[in-house]
Amino acid sequence: MYSGNRSGDQGYWEDGAGAEGAAPAGTRSPAPLFSPTAYERLALLLGCLALLGVGGNLLVLLLYSKFPRLRTPTHLFLVNLSLGDLLVSLFGVTFTFASCLRNGWVWDAVGCAWDGFSGSLFGFVSITTLTVLAYERYIRVVHARVINFSWAWRAITYIWLYSLAWAGAPLLGWNRYILDIHGLGCTVDWRSKDANDSSFVLFLFLGCLVVPVGIIAHCYGHILYSVRMLRCVEDLQTIQVIKMLRYEKKVAKMCFLMAFVFLTCWMPYIVTRFLVVNGYGHLVTPTVSIVSYLFAKSSTVYNPVIYIFMNRKFRRSLLQLLCFRLLRCQRPAKNLPAAESEMHIRPIVMSQKDGDRPKKKVTFNSSSIIFIITSDESLSVEDSDRSSASKVDVIQVRPL
């Protein structure tokens, strides 16, 4: 996979990595596109991004494995996202980092294929996970449907299969992986006018950008509308319900912020590739290309920071990890297993309205916080689950 040949055809690189007639990556190595100082700075930036990405995402995985209270279906999606970001930090920038140290691409065609495949696969996993997470928020907040681990694991399996299909297509002949414009990594052939290659680029934009972004916007738009409507319902104005509504809003904000930050980091890369596809590749210089690449890879650093600062359970778990004995004495009941805490359902609000309106009992699950209002206080929760919609009205879900 390693090639020590540093001599090359400068004209090939001036036309761009995706120019027609370009030789496969590794058969011809380019002359340096940047100065030695620039390569050193790029290596330093990539090394810092990789270290921060590995450290932050490993911390998320450690917290999830150590603290049972974090083991919920929603957190499982966050862990899958962190796993994808961790793999990007470990494998997605390795060849580019080594090439920066050698002042240019030094790998053969197999190395180029692996670099393009790994970067594409883990990037697709991230955007698809954020899309599924938005849908999960949507069905739980808007439709008050509770998902379980079985649903979450199936969704994660489909996420990886879907991403693997898109990343593996160029290896099977639908488009190909070639050296990028900056000459330090590989990507799909954006410039090719061949019908086979251009059709892949078109469907890739639709399947991995337009559709996911559309689903994310639709889901969070409905979540925002539903939360505002629920806050206007007079019967829900109890202290506990108001707290839950605020909690739902915070969770939705956190998930939306993750999607927004991810798309913001990838937007320069998407714009530059869109210019190349539409015949404006001369505007995308190697410097512009590598800067957009660095912005895209920086997305792996931000998600762990968002978890810690916006998710109270992750924040408390981190503090408990750092000061275990002190917090264990202060909060002995906080580290109960998730399965144990979900077994008991208890009433939290009893409200009596004036007139002939029956007494209403609001119950909830102490882990997933499912509010159930029944018109008959003698009706048990088990009976409520089997009763018709006229007797039971599920009005809110707290998922984490």
From Swiss-Prot:
Subcellular location as annotated: Cell membrane; Cytoplasm
Extracellular side stretches: 1-38, 101-115, 176-199, 278-285
Disulfide partners: 112-186
Sample GO molecular function, one term: G protein-coupled receptor activity
Topology within the bilayer: Multi-pass membrane protein
Keyword Lipoprotein: yes
Expression sites by tissue: Expressed in the eye (at protein level). Expressed in tracheal airway smooth muscle. Expressed in brown adipocyte tissue; expression becomes more abundant during differentiation. Strongly expressed in brain. Highly expressed in the preoptic area and paraventricular nucleus of the hypothalamus. Shows highly patterned expression in other regions of the brain, being enriched in selected regions of the cerebral cortex, cerebellar Purkinje cells, a subset of striatal neurons, selected thalamic nuclei, and a subset of interneurons in the ventral horn of the spinal cord.
Subunit field text: Interacts with MC1R; the interaction results in a decrease in MC1R-mediated cAMP signaling and ultimately a decrease in melanin production in melanocytes.
Protein name: Opsin-3
Organism: Mus musculus
